[in-house]
Every structure is written in C-alpha cells, then in structure tokens.
Amino acid sequence: MNRADIKADKTFDITVADHKFILPSEKMIINTNDKVMFNVTSKDLTYGFGLFREDNTMMFQMQVLPGHNNDILWHFESPGVYTIRSTEYSGPKGIGMIEKNVVEVID
C-alpha cells in the first residue's frame, strides 16, 4: 500500500514554537475508523510529537524538525482520549510540553 494513495478523513495542522504546541482547536474530535493526518511544524527547535493513551502508553511518535515537512497518518480503530507530549529533548522547558486529553476518538 502506497501512503500517497491513502486519503485522510481529517487533517490537523499543529505548530510548535517556544516549547508550546499551538493546536487548531481546544479539542480535536475524530470518528472511529478515521484516517487522520497530523501536520506538525516547528518554528524553532527539534521537538517530538507523541500521542499517548490514558494509561500513559505511547500510541505513536515522530520527530518534528524545523524547516521540514513533518506529518504522520494514523488510522484510529477504537474510541479513546489521548494526550499530546513532546518526545524529544528540547532543553529544560521541554518537560512541560504536555497537552492533556486534547484528542478524542468517538463512535
């Protein structure tokens, strides 16, 4: 299967700058079985973009490099609430890069 042939049901554009995630909305709502593209742009440093389950296990992650196209396509197969965290060391402020319960997958 070629990724270029897969059409995303939803796309979320996220910016990262000064150790903060700038989200497109307060909560990103996704329907079960949607394929979602997360486009993440860094304005300054290399960051990580990870999605974590409620039990703190990681669902996926990618590095976010400034000046590059950073995206991930994910198929959400079941409902849940997820937290975004930076998964890359970006200095002492990076430990606070957590956006709790901002992704929700619904039936």
Could you tell me what each predicted segment is?
Residues 41, 45-66, 94:
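Histidine- and aromatic-enriched segments that form or immediately flank copper-ligand environments
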Residues 18, 40-44, 53-55, 78, ...:
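A mature extracytoplasmic/lumenal domain signature
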Residues 2, 31-33, 39, 56, ...:
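Detector for Asparagine
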Residues 23, 29-53, 79-81:
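Extracytosolic and intramembrane catalytic regions of membrane-associated proteins
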Residues 4-35:
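N-terminal edge beta-strand
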Residues 1-8, 62-107:
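Extracellular/periplasmic metallocenter environments
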Residues 22-26, 56-60, 68-71:
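Short structured motifs
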Residues 13-15, 37-39, 102-104:
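Soluble periplasmic/extracytoplasmic beta-strand elements of cell-envelope proteins
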